[in-house]
């Protein structure tokens, strides 16, 4: 009863918040903030995400947990001209009540073991060098911008990475034109030295979206293609490690219709998973999933209703709810399964660069069967899990000096 009381409150809460900011026709219409910075300017930039996340998960797919804390990234930003900019600072992650943090990337790699720890706060350096080749093209080195979750479909990217995982770091290329959007990045997560005790690890991602205006400012066709590749490898290591590469591919189509301030969308994605190499980390060598959905957007409020059907599928960066194996019961794998998925998001603009964000997710798992070595056939009735998060975003810059 308590779970459903919380659930009812959240649905009402997200729905009744007032909306003030103008909603863009497409969530692909992002801009590169660096291009708006005046040349020869030194700024102090603060990026803070104070969050409270509660994951009320039920069943044998994954554990429930809560995340109370903040991700604070203060930095100095300098624009040499309208083409080149540098940003350097430090990124700090704090979970309230936690006093010991393992020195590993805060992202899902099940084989990783931590061998060093920090006390009080998880702290890493932050650096970003950007070249604005044109107003529509940007190349960046160092930390990667993933504030928009790379616009990947929900089954491929867990929203929690945005504010709880370490900032991605490597190389990023972005293109944003009226009918084309491209976000390609390489996130280098583990560097190895000679005789190191862990493997070289990186993630490669690509999101390419083609947009076609059927009726200008009214009807738009969007064709997205996404790729996520994770690799474990390396040479001259102290230990016997296997080399393996996993990949997720998503291809889809979406139709957006705009009527005044309301945007209605209908679309579907086909997702594919593959493992190249010998490894016992993941349970499957290949799998698939389908993800049809409808979405309603009114200014800063979005509500999505989706159906998810999968077999032998592994989501590399997504929620465990989109995988065909259990993360809380060892060696339990599920047969072909399906579920209903609901997601609501809202952003309320408070001040220049400051906003209050809220999101809610519901996973309604239908009848589920699976296998676990040494046990009888697992048969479970449907169950409902949900999660919600509230985030206070402060993204603000102060001009220190203009040269």
Where are the regions a protein language model picked out?
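Bacterial Sec-dependent N-terminal signal peptides
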Residues: 1-31, 173, 382-403
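Exposed, low-structure sequence patches enriched in small/polar residues
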Residues: 3, 47-49, 69, 126, ...
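Transmembrane beta-strand segments of Gram-negative outer membrane beta-barrel proteins
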Residues: 30-56, 86
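Flexible, solvent-exposed loop segments that connect beta-strands
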Residues: 57-61, 102-115, 154-156, 323-328, ...
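Surface-exposed loop and membrane-interface regions of Gram-negative outer-membrane beta-barrel proteins
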Residues: 83-133, 154-155
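Surface-exposed coil loops of outer-membrane beta-barrel proteins
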Residues: 138-209
């Amino acid at each position: 009863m308590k779970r459903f009381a919380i659930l009812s409150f959240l649905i009402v809460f997200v729905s009744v918040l007032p909306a003030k900011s103008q909603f863009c026709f497409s969530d692909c219409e992002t801009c590169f903030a660096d291009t708006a910075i005046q040349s020869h300017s030194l700024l102090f930039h603060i990026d803070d995400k104070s969050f409270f996340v509660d994951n009320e998960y039920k069943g044998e797919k994954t554990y429930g947990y809560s995340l109370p804390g903040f991700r604070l990234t203060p930095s100095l930003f300098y624009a040499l001209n309208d083409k080149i900019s540098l940003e350097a600072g430090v990124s700090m992650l704090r979970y309230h009540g936690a006093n010991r943090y393992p020195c590993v990337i805060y992202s899902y790699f099940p084989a990783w073991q931590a061998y060093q720890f920090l006390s009080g706060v998880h702290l890493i350096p932050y650096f970003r060098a950007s070249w604005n080749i044109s107003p529509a093209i940007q190349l960046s080195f160092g930390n990667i911008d993933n504030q928009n979750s790379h616009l990947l479909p929900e089954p491929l990217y867990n929203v929690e990475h945005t504010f709880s995982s370490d900032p991605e770091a490597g190389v990023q290329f972005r293109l944003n034109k009226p009918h084309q959007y491209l976000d390609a990045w390489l996130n280098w997560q583990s560097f190895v030295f000679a005789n190191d005790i862990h493997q070289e690890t990186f993630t490669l991602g690509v999101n390419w979206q083609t947009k076609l205006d059927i009726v200008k400012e009214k009807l738009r066709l969007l064709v997205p293609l996404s790729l996520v590749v994770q690799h474990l490898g390396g040479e001259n290591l102290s230990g016997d490690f296997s080399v393996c590469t996993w990949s997720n591919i998503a291809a889809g189509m979406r139709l957006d219709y705009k009527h005044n301030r309301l945007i209605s969308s209908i679309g579907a994605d086909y997702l594919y998973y593959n493992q190249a190499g010998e490894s016992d980390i993941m349970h499957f060598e290949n799998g698939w999933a389908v993800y049809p959905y409808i979405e309603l957007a009114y200014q800063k409020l979005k509500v999505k209703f989706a159906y998810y059907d999968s077999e032998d599928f592994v989501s590399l960066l997504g929620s465990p709810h989109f995988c065909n194996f259990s993360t809380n019961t060892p060696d339990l794998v599920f047969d072909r399964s399906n579920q209903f998925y609901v997601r609501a998001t809202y952003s309320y603009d408070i001040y220049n660069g400051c906003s209050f964000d809220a999101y809610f997710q519901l996973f309604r798992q239908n009848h589920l069967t699976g296998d676990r070595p040494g046990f009888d056939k697992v048969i479970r009735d449907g169950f409902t899990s949900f999660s919600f998060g509230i985030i206070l975003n402060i993204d603000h810059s102060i001009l220190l000096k203009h040269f």
